[in-house]
């Protein structure tokens, strides 16, 4: 496509719609030569034909003037933006430059975490090694990561339970969750290695047991989780996704095979008293520590689960992580919230309490995620749905996966609820079946402690199914999904009268009406193309991408240019408007250019050669003899190749020079700056003889007040330039839009006047906007000449001699550009020059 549009008008046949359909079928649908749009021109006041003849010539001049001012505004806008583009680019590069490479830390953020962890290590190692030396002795040989990030629970038990005897049966759980999840590891395995390869991985398991948490620093779990996320981030997408499914299944299986007890802390509550592996209720063997390791904190650009992160957050008094924050670091999305694996159950209560009060409502936390809310309310909802005859097979149920996903995002972002993407019908059917089975079992079996544990485990599987389904999308898909989600949030919250963030200024668009035009016919009302009906008139073109949209959906601005006025008055309104823009542009551009010129001169003086640059930043007070009645100090510029000559002979240039008073102050590629002290009465003689020897004396007087004033002047100029830059750019954008809109209205006036002059009264013509294909311009001309050649027999054959190439009054172009139909060009390549 081209940046050039054509506006033509043809006399109406029986109806103007028929004229448009005939032309559109022949040029666009059959031969695909162009894209056609209806160009709406209202029913303007015609006046007399004599008035139209004179107005036609004036409109041609006005068209040229308006286009000139529009391009002038666009070009100056490009200059102003180009002036700041290099500095902005340098600032962005300086802010986004990567830090030094490191093997274990991929970015500066994690490098800082590493240093913080090392400081915690030195402090923690001293106290922890004295109190519990057995914790450190096991991992003393590891040096690749901070010691406080390694698993320290291979031989540690919870303080609430005695240590397991050495002759414990093999089916009993080990002392720590790390050993449960990775029995093959000598130091406590890790779930962080999600790939299927057997390459050695750094061992930095974080144990959530009470002993380790009591000794570890507050930020250990959070730091370890960050490092774990970085390790996971280096894996491929396919292995990450498959391993995530396996890991979630493993955690779900561990939780399913154990009951839930009421522990003294979050980790104890999340601990499935691992001694209950036989499926018992609340009290079995000795309950060791939590079987849910913090290695389940996956970073796959999806909502993740981590019991250790929540445990560390609940134990830490620093509150460094916010439970309700969606943090995005290094393009990796990590949800750090209260909705972890250990919190996906109902509110924990003792089994005896449930047995004695089976219908008591669970306690609801003040702030819960949608998953927690749906699970805490599911028991009552299931019974109510059964009594009312409702089923859970509806895919739009609030307990479905789609609703949970949508509510979860609503809860994280605190935005109005929106529909999320639909999952497959198979997932909906399986979810509905699972919920229906839960409802049936709820009413068929009394709520015993064993049934309650099974019911909670089913909800744990359901919640993990939600997280598992939310984690099966690759990283790139989540990035694009959240970008589109942000666009939806902005589009729902923004209105036409609000601030336009992309363009940086607030512009309230003028509402335009769409009058029924006798020249376009009643069937063309509100149509911008033969296939679509716009919901509302186009706004002002606030960006380059909106110029074609404004042009193809053009409608007359009834507020600025009322159609009750005569054509001459409308032309005068446009002329005054553009004249005002031109005058303001001259004033604003002159003020800004003067400010920029003064600032550039000062910058050149700071960065130029020693012959021209300002010496105030180079000299110091100790370089001068001040407040002396007889002595003075001069600054001399010496060519670099003659520096030795100066040091040898400067005392002999004239009399009364202080011996050995010269010293080198500054040098560049070509010159050296020296000072010399002498008597005031021989200063002029010294300058004369120094010039003869090609030594240049700079006129400089050291005055601290003047030097400070010079520095303040440059700071003031920079501040003034920054203050003027923003309003100037906004003014240029607004007035560029105003000038472009005025230009299109002038084109519409010219089409109307020329159509009346050619086709006569009553007004009956159809104006059409054509967007020609770049390779089909010549063929399009031939088709239009065949279609409308009968309107002018002289040019129907397309042969015009050069002798007849003369200007036609009122048209503004030669006969070589004359066609049997009304034709005007609209070129929008001014935007390319503006580089907005």
UniProtKB/Swiss-Prot annotation:
Regions of compositional bias (Polar residues) in chain numbering: 319-348, 364-374, 496-511
The gene coding this protein:
Vha44
Q: Fetch the Gene3D superfamilies from UniProt.
A: 3.30.70.100, subunit c (vma5p) of the yeast v-atpase, domain 2, Vacuolar atp synthase subunit c, domain 1
**GO BP terms:** proton transmembrane transport
Q: Which InterPro entries match?
A: ATPase_V1-cplx_csu (IPR004907), Vac_ATP_synth_c_sf (IPR036132)
Q: Which family does it belong to?
A: Belongs to the V-ATPase C subunit family.
Report the gene knockout effect: RNAi-mediated knockdown specifically in pHCl-2 expressing enterocytes delays pupariation and reduces food intake.
User: Which GO terms label this protein's molecular function in UniProt?
Assistant: proton-transporting ATPase activity, rotational mechanism
The alphabetized UniProt keywords are: Hydrogen ion transport, Ion transport, Transport
Residues of the region (Disordered) are 116-169, 302-403, 415-453, 496-544
What are the record's GO terms for cellular component?
A: plasma membrane proton-transporting V-type ATPase complex; vacuolar proton-transporting V-type ATPase, V1 domain
What is said about its interaction partners and assembly?
A: V-ATPase is a heteromultimeric enzyme made up of two complexes: the ATP-hydrolytic V1 complex and the proton translocation V0 complex. The V1 complex consists of three catalytic AB heterodimers that form a heterohexamer, three peripheral stalks each consisting of EG heterodimers, one central rotor including subunits D and F, and the regulatory subunits C and H. The proton translocation complex V0 consists of the proton transport subunit a, a ring of proteolipid subunits c9c'', rotary subunit d, subunits e and f, and the accessory subunits VhaAC45 and ATP6AP2.
- What is the protein's known function? Subunit of the V1 complex of vacuolar(H+)-ATPase (V-ATPase), a multisubunit enzyme composed of a peripheral complex (V1) that hydrolyzes ATP and a membrane integral complex (V0) that translocates protons. V-ATPase is responsible for acidifying and maintaining the pH of intracellular compartments and in some cell types, is targeted to the plasma membrane, where it is responsible for acidifying the extracellular environment. Subunit C is necessary for the assembly of the catalytic sector of the enzyme and is likely to have a specific function in its catalytic activity.
Transport in keyword set: yes
Where are the compositionally biased (Basic residues) regions?
116-144
- Protein name listed in UniProt: V-type proton ATPase subunit C
- Which regions are flagged for Low complexity bias? 302-316, 425-450, 512-529
Q: In which tissues is it expressed?
A: In larvae, expressed in the ring gland, CNS, imaginal disks and lymph gland.
Q: Which organism is it from?
A: Drosophila melanogaster
Residue stretches of biased makeup (Pro residues): 160-169
